[in-house]
């Protein structure tokens, strides 16, 4: 998998970081809204 060079590492890190921030944001927002307790 390493050394193929098809997907830049910075692109993976950027997409992964945005996904993590989005999930955390939804979870925190859900906690304040009372939805996070059901998760």
UniProtKB/Swiss-Prot annotation:
Keywords: Chloroplast, Membrane, Photosynthesis, Photosystem II, Plastid, Reaction center, Thylakoid, Transmembrane, Transmembrane helix. It holds the Pfam family PsbJ. Gene3D superfamilies: 6.10.250.2070. GO terms for biological process: photosynthesis. SUPFAM superfamilies: Photosystem II reaction center protein J, PsbJ. It comes from the Eukaryota. It is found in: Plastid, Chloroplast thylakoid membrane. GO terms for cellular component: chloroplast thylakoid membrane; photosystem II reaction center. The keyword 4Fe-4S does not apply. The chain crosses the membrane at residues 9-29. InterPro entries: PSII_PsbJ, PSII_PsbJ_sf. It is a single-pass membrane protein. One of the components of the core complex of photosystem II (PSII). PSII is a light-driven water:plastoquinone oxidoreductase that uses light energy to abstract electrons from H(2)O, generating O(2) and a proton gradient subsequently used for ATP formation. It consists of a core antenna complex that captures photons, and an electron transfer chain that converts photonic excitation into a charge separation. Belongs to the PsbJ family. PSII is composed of 1 copy each of membrane proteins PsbA, PsbB, PsbC, PsbD, PsbE, PsbF, PsbH, PsbI, PsbJ, PsbK, PsbL, PsbM, PsbT, PsbX, PsbY, PsbZ, Psb30/Ycf12, at least 3 peripheral proteins of the oxygen-evolving complex and a large number of cofactors. It forms dimeric complexes. PANTHER family: PHOTOSYSTEM II REACTION CENTER PROTEIN J. This is Photosystem II reaction center protein J. It comes from Gracilaria tenuistipitata var. liui.
């Amino acid at each position: 998998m390493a050394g193929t060079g098809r997907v830049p590492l910075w692109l993976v890190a950027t997409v992964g970081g945005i996904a993590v921030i989005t999930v955390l944001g939804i979870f925190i927002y859900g906690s304040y809204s009372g939805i996070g307790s059901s998760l």
